[in-house]
Every structure is written in structure tokens, then in C-alpha cells.
Amino acid sequence: MAANTTSTAATSSPGGMSLSLLPIVLLSVALVVGLPGNSFVVWSILKRMQKRSVTALLVLNLALADLAVLLTAPFFLHFLARGTWSFEVTGCRLCHYVCGVSMYASVLLITIMSLDRSLAVARPFVSQKVRTKAFARWVLAGIWVVSFLLAIPVLVYRTVTPKNKTLICDSRYPSDGHKVFHLLFEAITGFLLPFLAVVASYSDIGRRLQARRFRRSRRTGRLVVLIILAFAAFWLPYHLVNLVEAGRTLAGWDKNSPAGQRLKLARYVLIALAFLSSSVNPVLYACAGGGLLRSAGVGFVVKLLEGTGSEVSSTRRGGTLVQTPKATPTCPEPGPTDSFMTSSTPPESSK
């Protein structure tokens, strides 16, 4: 998201003006849905959840990352509507840096959720030992530090340049090598590696649950597919366009050619689509709430997270972990926060 969020200004041609409406619509939907939705999630966890599970902490940070990027949407909407950047170089770099940090934080949080669930299913005793709030806070701190570091190239390459009597907040590279490096670096660290980890984790979960013939393995399998597809749907097109541009740059093709301009316009729309990823999670929580939404009202997020935080209670008797099933929500949570807790999964520590 940080690479080229405003690389193409609203053009004066009729086609360009028509195309610019789609990003405006997508950004507006993301803002209208995501801002109150994620704010509600943050409020629910901080104000209504007395004992926050590790899952709740991960969801809280994911909502905060989504809120951060959504707060930049008004600046980009202003740019799209006016066709010029009005917030100077500092605003240009800050907005895009926030987008970059949020992108990395969101992807890393989803990856950690996936690895957490895989460990809980594959190594329940190990998961019980390491899955504490203290350890989770260290992991979360590490995620944010890494996200701030990975987004630094945005601060280096972003600037405001004049173009056709307007100002554009764009990336400016000293050489084509710098441009290719940035595009590949963002695609690999911001999508490819995390996506491979998510796929590997949930594939392992599905395989193990199917082998154990758990009662809900079929539903879990469907959720795994939905999670992976949703993750890819918002981010894969954006990174593919960046990879194509990196290839064109290496081949020495003219970026001002008709094909190059179409590529810019495609990214123009896909970046706005990526913004929607910051608004989809609250919608998934509401859908997952089902009966909880009707019975618990505004407290459904708390009930949902309490249900997904631990589907079993565990006690040690004579050195053996004994699980006792608890009540579960009407449906498991679809999305990166789905706990996939089974009868082999230990509870979250309250440390």
C-alpha cells in the first residue's frame, strides 16, 4: 500500500475522470464501514472485556492497525477529488508511512494468528507454555517494531513533485535499481512470505483436524479456504501490479507508453481496493456473531472472542493434561481471528 498510493493523479481526460470515481467510492466505503467498525472492536475489547485473552490482544492490535490506515483515507480522498496534493512533503511522507506500517502490521498479525493456531493444534502442550499474555505482548511489540522498520523506504522515496500544474505525492527513485528493489522488497515482505506462512499453517491445521476426524473439521476446512481467499483477494492484485511494473522497469520499457499508463491506472484502483481490507474484519465479526449478535447486542464481540479464545478448559491431573469441553459460539469466527480450537488445544494463560 505504501509503494504508489497516489502515483497517478486524477487525469483531465474523460476516461481518467471516470476511472478516478471508482477509487473514491472504494475509499469512501472503507472509511464509512471500517472506521466505526474497528472503533467498535477496540472499544469492546478495552472497555467491556475484563480478562483479555491472547486472541483478543491480537484482534485489538489488528483493529488498531486498520484504524491507523483508515485515518489517512480523508487525505487521499481530498487528493482524488481535487487532483492535487495539498499537504506538503511532510504530509505526503507521513500518510504513506502510516499506510506502510499498517500494511506490514496487519499482515504480520494475521501471520502470527495463523502460526498460533497451527501450534495449538500440532503442539498443544508447547502452546500452553508459550501462549501467555506476557509472551504475546513481547510478540506484539516486535511486530510493531518490525513494521516501523520495514516501512522506512517509504520515507526515503516519497516526495511531492509538480506535474501538469498540480502537485503529486509520488515515489521518486535515484535509479531504476532503487525502484525495482522497493517494489520487490514490498511484494516479498508484505505479501509473499506472510502468505506462504498462512497457507502452510492452515493447510497443516486442516490436515491434522481431518486426520483426527473432528466433528467440525469440514466447517473448519471451509473457513480455511475463505480466510486464504479473502487474504489474497485484497492484496494479491496490488502486489502483482507492482511485480509487473518491476519487470517492465528491468526490461527498460517506457513508463509513459499506453501500456505503462494503463498499469498506473490499474494500480490506482487496486490500492483503493487494498484499503477495503482494513474494513472487512468488523464485517466478518458481525457475520460470525450470528445468534450472539441477537442475544448479546453490543457485547457480541466480547462474547465472540471469549468463545474463540478457548473452546476447552484444561486441568493437570498427575502430570496429564485433561480437557473438558466448553460451550462454543453458534459458528466459528471466519477470518484471521478464527481460533480453530479443538479438543487438543490448551486454554490461554491469564498471566
From Swiss-Prot:
Annotated TM spans: 22-44, 57-77, 94-115, 141-161, 180-200, 223-243, 269-289
Post-translational modification remark: Phosphorylated by GRK6 upon leukotriene B4 binding; which promotes desensitization.
Topology, Cytoplasmic side: 45-56, 116-140, 201-222, 290-351
Region (Disordered): 311-351
Extracellular face residues: 1-21, 78-93, 162-179, 244-268
Record-level GO cellular component terms: plasma membrane
Transmembrane found in the keyword field: yes
Biased composition, class Polar residues, residue ranges: 311-327, 339-351
Expression sites (tissue/organ): Exclusively expressed in polymorphonuclear leukocytes.
Keywords: Cell membrane, G-protein coupled receptor, Glycoprotein, Membrane, Phosphoprotein, Receptor, Transducer, Transmembrane, Transmembrane helix
Stored InterPro entries: Formyl_rcpt-rel, GPCR_Rhodpsn, GPCR_Rhodpsn_7TM, Leukotriene_B4_rcpt, Leukotriene_B4_typ-1_rcpt
Membrane topology of the entry: Multi-pass membrane protein
BP term (GO), one: signal transduction
Gene Ontology molecular function terms on file: G protein-coupled peptide receptor activity; leukotriene B4 receptor activity; leukotriene receptor activity
Similarity field: Belongs to the G-protein coupled receptor 1 family.
PANTHER family: CHEMOTACTIC RECEPTOR, G-PROTEIN COUPLED RECEPTORS FAMILY 1 PROFILE DOMAIN-CONTAINING PROTEIN-RELATED
Protein purpose: Receptor for leukotriene B4, a potent chemoattractant involved in inflammation and immune response.
Protein's UniProt name: Leukotriene B4 receptor 1
